[in-house]
Amino acid sequence: MRKSLLIIGLTTIACLTPAHSESGMGWVSYPGGEGPGKGKHVVLLAGDEEYRSEEAMPMLAKILSQHHGFKCTVLFSADPDGTINPNLGTSLGQPEALASADAIVMSLRFRKWADEAMKYFDDAIQRGIPVIALRTSTHAFQLPPTSGFKHYNQFGKKVLGESWVTHWGKHKAEATRGVIESANRENPLLRGVTDVFGDSDVYEAYPPADAVILLRGQVLKGMNPADPAADHEKTRATDKQKQGVNDPMMPVAWTREVKNSSDKTNKILCTTMGAATDLASEGLRRLVVNGVFWGLGLEIPVKAEVTPVGEFVPSKYSFDAFKKGTQAADYEPAK
């Protein structure tokens, strides 16, 4: 993996036909087709202020749609005129798309959706559909006390397996190398997953005993894939004891199967990686795609196709650094 992946665009080998993509106020949809995902609808939720989920989710949606046959709909936070605005935490475009979701891929942070939008999300969860959750989704919601769904403020801890704790690696200074958990290296979710790297930092995280750890995050001394492992000490937030920052390494990807209040089971894949720049890593993209297959009970390919459809040049993560004036239609393939 080379740093140049973050600088140059990644393009597909073949030219794919985008004839039936659609978009509207705060949403874009890509058609399903032939492939293992035929007849399945994946809804991807983009809504965080820092890590450019509004760029990452359309890229993942196009991979799932064009390479694997899933119908995919991306829902954004947007201003009333449809301009994408990740800072508008109360907004979710076309939440009714969740009514037909077979799986959710989410990259959210402190959303404050109205009860009408939360009802669609809650209904989807209660149906027992799988959830693939990235980065700040551990703290996806910050609903007000008046919300009928305020219990979702605990969604990270109770469902995904962890909430926000703190940055474990130094933010914007120590990148992450994904290290496969040796005890679970034969897990089907790890098929084709190699050389995972992200230039976002490791989060402090302690998933519960029922979680199956897939990857741990090695904190690096710098921001490049070839940098050596960091060797300083860090104080844990939980018990205030010091440990080597990589001894042990924090989990950065795990699965759970969680029974909800409707007595249905949600299959969960959570990763604390997932900035748009992290998803320049082929291995991390493949883990997310494998998660969709696993969640839906589909056979996970030996090496799933995860080449971006068209150009993918992820913006560097930072608050208020989103591309101004962008509409959902801008994420439709060129016609």
Language model features with spans:
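Positively charged n-region of N-terminal signal peptides that target proteins for export
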Residues: M1-S4
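Bacterial N-terminal signal peptides
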Residues: I7-T17
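Extracellular ligand-binding/catalytic regions of CAZymes and related secreted enzymes
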Residues: E22-G37, E55-A56, Q66-H67, M223, ...
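Helical hinge/lid and interdomain linker segments adjacent to catalytic or ligand-binding clefts
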Residues: V28-Y30, E34, V43-L45, E49-A140
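An acidic, glycine-rich "communication" segment
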Residues: K38-G39, L134-E233, A304-K335
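Active-site rim elements
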Residues: G47-E50, G169, A173-G178, L190, ...
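Short, solvent-exposed loop/turn segments at secondary-structure junctions
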Residues: E49-E50, R111, T138-A140, Q218-G222, ...
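Short glycine-/acidic-enriched loop or helix-start segments at secondary-structure transitions
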Residues: E54-E55, D115-A117, Q142-P144, D201, ...
